[in-house]
Amino acid sequence: MATAAPDIITTKLERSFAALDTDHDGHLDRQDYQRLADRYLDVYHLGPDDRRARALHAFLQTYWLELLRHADVQEDRLSRDEYVAAVRLASADTSRLNLADGLGHVLFDVIDANSDNQIAREEFTRFLTDVWNLEEADALKAFRTLDTDGDDTVSRPEFLQAIRGYFLLSDPDAPGSLFFGTP
């Protein structure tokens, strides 16, 4: 009997769940998103009044509320399966929040530490290794894949396209599929 190929989007979202569930309780809650924001602020040395920090906090709060809305759960926490289903729904429903583009712009502004409107290899590697705890080799592979024009930087359009691909494409070789390692 043949086994079905794994659903790449589910695999990607399960990996992001594991990375977000830093207290390893099997659920995500608002505190997990607060810890994520704190990691970004710490890694990028952003104070609470920095506009990038405020934008990150505002987006993550809205994102969390959208996940809860789409999950239709009684508690303010999500299991892995509830998270995967909610992210899929929130990614497709842009009536209140365009998840992929909103996240892409907020993260790009944080990662682009020198504000030159492009992400250098070092900036991108820092993002995946220091914030998301990926191995440097995986971060460099992801960088090379996202740099679709080969200019050794990731432009805002390249980054946004990769974020969209992360949430919406089932192609394991798509640039956004490599954010949390090879699916």
Can you say where each PLM-predicted feature lies in the sequence?
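Domain-level signal for compact, non-enzymatic binding modules
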Residues: 2-3, 50, 86, 93, ...
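Acidic/histidine-enriched, glycine/proline-rich intrinsically disordered or flexible terminal extensions
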Residues: 165-183
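Aromatic-enriched hydrophobic runs in primary sequence
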Residues: 4, 35, 60-64, 94, ...
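The feature marks the first
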Residues: 2-46, 50
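Primarily EF-hand calcium-binding motifs
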Residues: 10-25, 53-77, 101-116, 138-156, ...
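Divalent metal-cofactor coordination and adjacent catalytic microenvironments
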Residues: 97
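Amphipathic regulatory helices of Ca2+-sensor modules
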Residues: 29-47, 77-94, 118-132, 155-169
